[in-house]
């Protein structure tokens, strides 16, 4: 593609050199640059791409997009100066890959909890309807039934647009995507055209990056502020920030709720460990999911599918066939009648939701034993809160390691224990080895009890000192049970 065609997507401050050159590819990683490519220098949280301009030129880059043109420009290289390289990168990438989001309906899901479940269930629902569908999520990316491994909730703009381009080439008609607060703040979704957006809820998370809940809220809200006029914004009225999210959007606003009058109204009629009986807009349906939070997730899926043009009755039929997402309230039964639940709950609110769901089914007929940790090099403020919430709603608590990353596991555990009082401590153990912690919970459990293993869910690794070691909560439980 000619450089001057690419530049139509942005408003450069200035261009020095030839803008009619052929660009063979676009890159933000100097190590991956090939001959004839455009290298785009971004200022990241860890490094500044401007420092790698010489390396990119050495690798064969013929054009450089940057905020500051080097003091000694290299002859024969075209320099494009922009005010905001973060914003420009997404727009350039989407243009280079043929504006893929104009070729299908793209729906983004944002919020603290429920993103993966809602995006994945929408993907499964529209595959049930017979469409070719794409999914971009924390667990895995899919182009129809072909899995593509994932590193972040939302990939960098180049990877993201390349993936969306593949989805368009493969004939996907719908794409469902988790949209993280990081990706909104870092403009990774700049240039994408959304057909709709869904807001789930907002509770404490990622404060290691956003610093304050207000900044975190602003990042989420920006997604809806930028939503186009002909798109829909579907927001959760049961969250106090539900209407805040959509107050400045140009899109059409719709609401869903389990508590209030809304466009999509739901309620739980019955709940047990095999599933729930629900009422959505005065239609009854039986589903294989547990917990109010899952009823809310399914209601969002129902609403979005209807807003994408499907009949309510057809959507309800599709929902009744769906299975829970990997690592999300994943139940395993032991031969002696103990139920273990593996769940990704890694925020205080998610933990409360899962524990409430367990108590809603148990109705006081069994003990709850919770195994929980907290991630290293992440928001330390939530650690004592996680432990306190676990203690409040459990008969026994075992504080253990999650992904310690570059921190000492015992120090993370100590941060968590600081949230407990003397009464809580009587029912709490701390075991740094996660496998031993799970084994201990299994030894303590009797027939009719429930063990919650929280925090890692679908993850099949434990990250220690920069190395990912194989570790799967579900595998460990099955091994102990059998």
From Swiss-Prot:
Cofactors demanded by this protein: Mg(2+)
GO function terms (MF aspect): ATP binding; magnesium ion binding; UDP-N-acetylmuramoylalanyl-D-glutamate-2,6-diaminopimelate ligase activity
Catalytic activity: UDP-N-acetyl-alpha-D-muramoyl-L-alanyl-D-glutamate + meso-2,6-diaminopimelate + ATP = UDP-N-acetyl-alpha-D-muramoyl-L-alanyl-gamma-D-glutamyl-meso-2,6-diaminopimelate + ADP + phosphate + H(+)
Enzyme class: ligase
Entry's EC annotation: 6.3.2.13
UniProt protein name: UDP-N-acetylmuramoyl-L-alanyl-D-glutamate--2,6-diaminopimelate ligase
Residues the entry annotates as binding meso-2,6-diaminopimelate: 378, 402-405, 455, 459
Chain location of the short sequence motif Meso-diaminopimelate recognition motif per the record: 402-405
Lineage: Bacteria, Pseudomonadati, Bacteroidota, Bacteroidia, Bacteroidales
Signal peptide annotation: none
Post-translational modifications reported in the UniProt record: Carboxylation is probably crucial for Mg(2+) binding and, consequently, for the gamma-phosphate positioning of ATP.
Subcellular location: Cytoplasm
Function noted in UniProt: Catalyzes the addition of meso-diaminopimelic acid to the nucleotide precursor UDP-N-acetylmuramoyl-L-alanyl-D-glutamate (UMAG) in the biosynthesis of bacterial cell-wall peptidoglycan.
Keywords: ATP-binding, Cell cycle, Cell division, Cell shape, Cell wall biogenesis/degradation, Cytoplasm, Ligase, Magnesium, Nucleotide-binding, Peptidoglycan synthesis
Amino-acid positions noted as binding ATP in the UniProt annotation, renumbered to this chain: 111-117
GO cellular component: cytoplasm
GO biological process, one term: regulation of cell shape
Classification via Pfam families: Mur_ligase (PF01225), Mur_ligase_C (PF02875), Mur_ligase_M (PF08245)
Source organism per UniProt: Bacteroides thetaiotaomicron (strain ATCC 29148 / DSM 2079 / JCM 5827 / CCUG 10774 / NCTC 10582 / VPI-5482 / E50)
Entry binding sites for UDP-N-acetyl-alpha-D-muramoyl-L-alanyl-D-glutamate: 30, 153-154, 180, 186, 188
Pathway in which this enzyme or protein is active: Cell wall biogenesis; peptidoglycan biosynthesis
N6-carboxylysine: modified positions: 220
Superkingdom per UniProt: Bacteria
InterPro entries: Mur-like_cat_sf, Mur_ligase_C, Mur_ligase_C_dom_sf, Mur_ligase_cen, Mur_ligase_N, MurE/MurF_N, UDP-N-AcMur-Glu-dNH2Pim_ligase
